[in-house]
């Protein structure tokens, strides 16, 4: 998988996680955390964000793909 494919994959995963986080927040009514779902999603989201950032930096520092 090249960097562009990786970037596209990560962006897709990020959007999916944002959607799931919004569903969990809606289900919780922003009041309480059910079964630790929110924390787990936030961990995943942060992990993908970090990987996305790393790939973007790698692309920029290498001057392209």
Provide a role label for each language-model segment.
Residues 1-2, 33-36:
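Short coil/turn linker and secondary-structure boundary residues
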Residues 1-19, 42:
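Short, charge/polar-rich alpha-helical segments
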Residues 1-4, 60-65:
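Short acidic DE-rich linear segments
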Residues 17, 24, 31, 38, ...:
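Hydrophobic stripe of amphipathic alpha-helices that form coiled-coil interfaces
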């Amino acid at each position: 998988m090249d960097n562009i494919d990786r970037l596209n994959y990560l962006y897709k995963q990020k959007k999916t996680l944002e959607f799931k986080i919004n569903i969990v927040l809606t289900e919780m009514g922003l009041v309480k955390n059910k079964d630790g779902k929110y924390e787990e999603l936030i961990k995943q989201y942060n992990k993908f964000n970090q990987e996305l950032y790393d790939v973007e930096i790698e692309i920029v520092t290498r001057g392209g793909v």
